[in-house]
């Protein structure tokens, strides 16, 4: 494919199931987009940089991508794969992370304070100085099958 998108914005687009093999996304912002099932992990790694606002990203994959400081704002991210992803200092503002998979994901300094429905194992994901709300603590203890009231 080898398409290059640099310093651009996609607004009100339905790009669901788009094949991005080898595509370069450099400083690309998606606003109010439907991006279901996209394999962002197949994009070119060099200078990969994206941000998302008011978008649907359900069933997409960012596995093994380097995405420090990425901003996800008011997004649905159900069943998204973040396996092996570097999300250092990323922000998940008002995002639904139901069934999102975090495993060997770099989460140092990431901000989950307004995110919800996440389940993250602190033992399997480095998360030094990551930020969570008190309501979100349950999502960090899920594997222990304990009741918090």
Please place each PLM-identified region on the residue numbering.
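Tandem repeat scaffolds
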Residues: 1-149
